[in-house]
């Protein structure tokens, strides 16, 4: 075994992980189940970040069936990766409940506290005692990047973001279930919150990602697309036109067909 070659290979692997979200996820979690779905989503997010950092203010609407890993990629790994590359930026993460948003917060912190992450991005850390002596918030609602301006805040959709500026805004499942999704009152309330609260907190060179299970054409995703033609839509059915499962390693075709038959 050539130790120098092994060290070189490891450094190359680390450098690739710093440049690619998909490779970053695999470096942090070698057991992560990769798929064409995960590759496509990560490639779109890599491009999204390029557009965001060049001032294009991108909007990405991502639709995928439940339990296929979209939240893992966008709400857990992406914020950690983003802070690694841009430790002075600010992330706002919203979901249908503050408890769920808090769980996402905890998962992001766990990733950023791992040895693997610290090797890739040593400048982006969550230490409670930074070298400059300034206290750093770290709880289930908010945390900061030590010795940098970066902050992560989370809240439930409909809740306040008063005083919080956001560069990368992530809305992950703004509606809890189909009953709420079909309610005109709920849809109106979410739209009003999006327009009057979420949008007003975005910075000049921001980017926003909206993920949701689609139950209605006039939901948040649909209205954003209607009002903002530049928004890009990335939609994945559980079973494609060729009759193949989206991620068979997670949900095989026979299971999806059973579910489809039950739902009608």
Predicted regions and their residues:
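Residue-level preference for the first positions of well-ordered beta-strands
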Residues: 59-61, 90-92, 151, 168, ...
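Contiguous, well-ordered alpha-helical segments that form the cores/surfaces of helical PPI scaffolds
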Residues: 43-46, 72-84, 172
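Non-catalytic, compositionally simple segments
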Residues: 179-264
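N-terminal accessory segments
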Residues: 1-58
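Walker A/P-loop
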Residues: 56-77
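Post-Walker A helix-loop "phosphate-sensing" segment adjacent to the P-loop in P-loop NTPases
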Residues: 81-90, 113-116
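Conserved nucleotide-state-sensing and coupling region of NTP-binding domains
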Residues: 94-158
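Conserved RecA-like ASCE ATPase "motif II neighborhood" in helicase/translocase motors
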Residues: 137-197
């Amino acid at each position: 075994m050539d130790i120098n070659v092994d060290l070189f290979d490891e450094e190359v692997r680390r450098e690739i992980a710093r440049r690619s979200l998909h490779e970053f996820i695999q470096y942090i979690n070698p057991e992560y189940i990769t798929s064409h779905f995960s590759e496509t989503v990560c490639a779109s997010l890599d491009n999204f970040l390029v557009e965001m950092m060049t001032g294009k203010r991108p909007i990405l609407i991502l639709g995928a069936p439940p339990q296929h890993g979209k939240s893992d990629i966008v709400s857990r790994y992406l914020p950690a990766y983003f802070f690694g590359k841009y430790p002075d930026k600010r992330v706002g993460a919203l979901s249908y409940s503050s408890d769920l948003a808090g769980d996402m917060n905890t998962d992001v912190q766990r990733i950023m506290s791992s040895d693997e992450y610290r090797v890739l991005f040593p400048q982006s850390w969550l230490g409670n005692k930074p070298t400059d002596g300034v206290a750093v918030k770290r709880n289930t609602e908010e945390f900061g990047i030590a010795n940098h301006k970066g902050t992560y805040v989370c809240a439930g959709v409909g809740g306040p973001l008063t005083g919080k500026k956001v560069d990368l805004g992530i809305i992950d499942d703004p509606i809890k279930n189909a009953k709420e999704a079909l309610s005109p009152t709920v849809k109106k309330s979410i739209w009003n919150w999006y327009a009057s609260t979420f949008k007003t907190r975005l910075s000049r060179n921001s980017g926003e990602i909206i993920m949701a299970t689609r139950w209605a054409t006039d939901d948040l995703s649909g209205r954003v697309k209607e009002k903002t033609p530049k928004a890009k839509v990335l939609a994945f059915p559980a079973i494609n036109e060729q009759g193949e499962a989206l991620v068979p390693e997670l949900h095989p075709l026979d299971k999806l067909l059973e579910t489809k038959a039950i739902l009608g």
